[in-house]
Amino acid sequence: MTIQIDDQGWGTPVGGVGIIVVRKETGELHYDIVPIEYFGKEMFNKKTYNAGAQSIVEKGFLKLKVRHDEDIEICSGCIHDKTIEWLKNEGYKFTVMKIDGIAQQKGESMFIEYLRTLGIPNPPAIVEETVDEYKAQFFYIMDWVREDPEGRKYLCKTGWKYFKKFYKDTNKD
């Protein structure tokens, strides 16, 4: 059996980041969101999102009853740094790689649903993971944020340099 670990929303300007753990052959999965608070100024600089992602993966491993003899494929994104360390310490065999297939498809679909719960109408989906798809989603969401920047600030990844400048510029009289 193969376990896949992937993330969704790292480059999305609003919301937290989705983490999915999937058993490829059966489709069993665990999905949760690293909360938006982890991407605010102070917590983002401390990289607390790494611990948030690791916690979700650990819960997924318990839920799916992952065994040490299963192959594990984990996305290379930096949000998984602490998870990779945990996998090593726990004695799991794993490969860091680009994730595709069911984990990527299900994760992106669940993340789009999450964005809808934040109030974003019809967020563009990431299907092929192309630069154009990511750009289209980013600018669509930023147009939505610009409609009410102060009212939607709590949903933004304000730890990003982009938002430090964005909110500095929008607060000018």
For each predicted feature, which ranges?
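RNase H-like, Mg2+-dependent phosphodiesterase core
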Residues: 1-173
